[in-house]
Amino acid sequence: MEEDTNISNKVIRYNTVNNIWETLPNFWTGTINPGVVSHKDDIYVVCDIKDEKNVKTCIFRYNTNTYNGWELVTTTESRLSALHTILYNNTIMMLHCYESYMLQDTFNVYTREWNHMCHQHSNSYIMYNILPIY
């Protein structure tokens, strides 16, 4: 798995109070397929980082009230890169595709627990950069 050099290691957000774009500090370089979701005052970046052995899925958090920079919240070993990242009810969901199976990992932002929930066989075509709806 190679790093996409066209993806910036910066996250920008639009400040609706001051009507300006803000660039948040850099987080780790070498990230693969970053997905960004926001939850209350926090911005989460879910990305894959490749090391010598395999790929790790990492979740970084940036609090927009404290501006203390990025915090590495958690990592987990992964053999698959996340296709899509979704936030729903305090849970960050990562969808993966392997052959004809859709795999779903969840991470609760309050309990900080991972749950590898579902291995669902899919008869439909799953494409990159398009959110599958079942």
UniProtKB/Swiss-Prot annotation:
SUPFAM superfamilies, per the entry: Kelch motif
Source organism superkingdom: Viruses
Gene3D superfamilies reported for this sequence: Kelch-type beta propeller
The family this protein is said to belong to: Belongs to the orthopoxviruses B21 protein family.
Record's miscellaneous remark: Corresponds to the C-terminal part of cowpoxvirus Kelch repeat and BTB domain-containing protein 2.
Protein name: Uncharacterized protein B21
Species for this entry: Vaccinia virus (strain Western Reserve)
